């Protein structure tokens, strides 16, 4: 099994960071604006990534979609999702956000765990997760993140 792991500091309390991770509106503020569902244990959150065409002209097409079952919500400490639908290599992987206070900020340890193997898309997703974690930090620290479709583009896949 392969894991993607990142660590980031955020100038906010664990409670504030948790709010951005544990609600549909919070996730829509840093990952993708196209976020729907129920943010409760046993609920499913759906995230969609849309292509609006060159310069936002032309037809809108769906580039990606994931259904995430909410496995754990521990206020101020942890959020855990299990991928139930999406790209084949994502199915049954776990996405984890562990929060702890440190030196007047929150340290977030992120994991996208249990990939069956390291493939090219693992590298792409690792880099994209890093950009979305920076978006999360911007959202919590400034009130405005960079969710898709306004996220940082890193390669020809997005």
Task: Please annotate each region the language model reported.
Residues 17-21, 27, 45, 70, ...:
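Hydrophobic pocket/interface hotspot
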Residues 84-136, 147:
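Beta-strand/loop substructures that line and gate deep hydrophobic ligand-binding cavities in soluble
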Residues 143-145:
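A short N-terminal helical cap/helix-turn-helix that marks the beginning
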Residues 54-75, 79-85:
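Helix-adjacent hinge/juxtasegments
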Residues 6-8, 66-72, 93-100:
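Hydrophobic/aromatic beta-strand elements that line small-molecule binding cavities or substrate pockets
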Residues 1-14:
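Terminal, regulation- and interaction-focused segments at domain boundaries
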Residues 14-15, 38-39, 71-77, 98-107:
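A short, structured loop/turn motif at beta-sheet edges
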Residues 5, 16, 25-65, 149-151, ...:
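Short beta-edge strand/loop motif at the mouth of beta-sheet-based domains
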């Amino acid at each position: 099994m392969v894991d993607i792991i990142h660590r980031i500091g955020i100038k906010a309390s664990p409670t504030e960071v948790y709010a951005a991770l544990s609600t549909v509106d919070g996730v829509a503020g840093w990952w993708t604006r196209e976020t729907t569902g129920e943010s409760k244990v046993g609920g499913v959150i759906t995230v969609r990534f849309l292509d609006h065409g060159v310069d936002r002209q032309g037809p809108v097409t769906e580039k990606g979609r994931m259904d995430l079952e909410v496995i754990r919500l521990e206020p101020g400490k942890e959020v855990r999702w299990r991928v139930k639908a999406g790209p084949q290599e994502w199915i049954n992987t776990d996405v984890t956000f562990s929060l702890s206070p440190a030196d007047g900020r929150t340290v977030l340890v992120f994991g996208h765990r249990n990939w069956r193997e390291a493939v090219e898309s693992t590298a792409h997703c690792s880099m994209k997760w890093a950009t979305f974690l920076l978006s999360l930090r911007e959202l919590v620290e400034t009130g405005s993140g960079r969710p898709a479709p306004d996220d940082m583009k890193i390669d020809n896949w997005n």
